[in-house]
Every structure is written in C-alpha cells, then in structure tokens.
Amino acid sequence: MAATAEVGVTATLGAAARAVATRQGLLNDPYAEPLLGAVGIDYLTRAIADHTFAADESPVGDDPAVTSLLDALAAHTRFVDEFLAEAGRAGIRQVVILASGLDTRPYRLWWPRGTTVYEIDRPRVLDFKAGVLRGLDARLATNRCAVGIDLRDDWPAALRRVGFDAAQPTAWVAEQLLVGYLKPAEQNRLLRRLTAASAAGSRLAADHLPTWDPLQLEAERAFVEGWRRRGLDIDLASLTHLGEYHYVPEYLATHGWEPAARSIADLLGGLGLGPRRGAGSGGAQFIPEYVTATRV
C-alpha cells in the first residue's frame, strides 16, 4: 500500500520533481528517487525510471498541467538551494524548513561549519523520511534537528525547546506551503509567528499563490484528471482552501520585511530552461509565484 497518507501529496510530488531533475542533471538529490520508491506509488516510480517526464516528446507532453508543475517544483528547489548557500556565506547559521516533507537538504547540500537545520513537519512524515534515509546509510552534512509538530500548533515554542535562538538571524524556507494549504487565518498566523521569531537580517524564501480564481480551480481539476488518466488517484482539491488571502510580498512589506518578487520564468532561466511546449494553456494557471525577503 502506498504511503502517501503518511507523507502527503505535496511531499510526494516534490520528491518526484527532484528525482526527475536529478536524472536530468539539474539537481543533485540522490535520495529523492529512493524516498519516492519507499512511498510506493508504482506509476511515479516507473515513470521516472522510464524518463516519462523528461521531454516534450514524452507521453505527458500534451499535459502541461503535469510537466509544468514538475519543472516549477524543480526550479524552486534549485533556487532555494542557492538561497541557502548565499545565506550561509552571509553568516547565517540557523535554518528552518517549514513543512519539510521529503526534503533532504541537511544531507545533500554544503553547509558552513556550525549550521543547524531545523526541519518542521508532522511526526509521521519526519519518522518516515528518517527511516528511509537510515536504510540508505545517508550521512548528514550539518547538524539537523527534527521538530515534529503540525504548523497549526505552537511550533515557535517547539523550536525554542530544541535550541532555536530567535535573537540570531534565520534563513526560513516555505515550499508548497503558502499556496492554499493553510486556511487564510492560519497562513496569516504562521507569517506573524515567523516574523516574531526573525531577528534583523533574517531571510525568507517561499512560493505562494494569491486567492484562487476560477481559472486556477479549473486548472487544478485538469491537473488531477491528468494523474487519474494514468492510474494515480490524487485528490489535490482536498489540500486547497478557498478564501481571501493576503498577497504575500505585500504582507511581508507591511510587517518589517523587504521582499523581492520573482516569476517562474526567472527560476526556469536559472536552470537554462524555458516553458514546456503547450505550457501557455490552462495547465500552468496554478504555477506559484515566488518571493524572497530580508527582515529589517
């Protein structure tokens, strides 16, 4: 039985994107494919091994809702990798990855001496990932601290209990989180808590979506249907909350941050990629926007 109930759909798709990008030479995540295999979704495992998502000539070339999202996830992963390296060069030694899922940055990236990476997610997600990585004899590249808690609960207190110091600058990562996964009030509370725990000089990298519109909802349905045609029953709609969301860069600008907005074209360009053939259709409607920000 597949373990998506344990690790979540977004974590699974993120691992799939990293596995594809690793085979293409765009990333170096040797753990993405084994983790995906451990989740146990046969279609994804076979598709990656067969290079199904690797080119416009592939069987999903007529479905940009699939390929465009995988490209976007891979591009943002690479962008965040570089964001964290830059934060390390600037002297930041405290990193928090919110809803870390199957991310393996504490194992696969270069880190300056003395860096601690805090990974926050539900305990069962962290336990699943740790078990698979132990079986792979994966070696940590820096100090890692797993914080098993739901982000709707008091995660700042949980961070403090394991040594997080809000007086020191932090590099924050929020991937596939500010995209409707939380209800509007929950997202606002998370951003308030993050801001309160951020000393001057802290940095944030996130993807985000403004309030979902009818075109995006239709694109989401097309995305889910694309997976179902290939035997993968993912109810992405169950992870999406409707409501009026603050535009994240504007929210940050009014709460003590200096934000810089970025587009998917910026991120794909950093990988030497352009849009997939057909990506201008409705399938790209729910590709997120991107922001980095510095606490002042």
Swiss-Prot record:
Its EC number is 2.1.1.-. GO terms for molecular function: methyltransferase activity. Keywords: Methyltransferase, S-adenosyl-L-methionine, Transferase. This is Putative S-adenosyl-L-methionine-dependent methyltransferase MAP_3881. InterPro entries: Ppm1/Ppm2/Tcmp, SAM-dependent_MTases_sf, SAM_mthyl_Trfase_ML2640-like. It comes from Mycolicibacterium paratuberculosis (strain ATCC BAA-968 / K-10) (Mycobacterium paratuberculosis). Belongs to the UPF0677 family. GO terms for biological process: methylation. Gene3D superfamilies: Vaccinia Virus protein VP39. NCBIfam families: mthyl_TIGR00027 (TIGR00027). Exhibits S-adenosyl-L-methionine-dependent methyltransferase activity. S-adenosyl-L-methionine binds at D121, D150, L151.
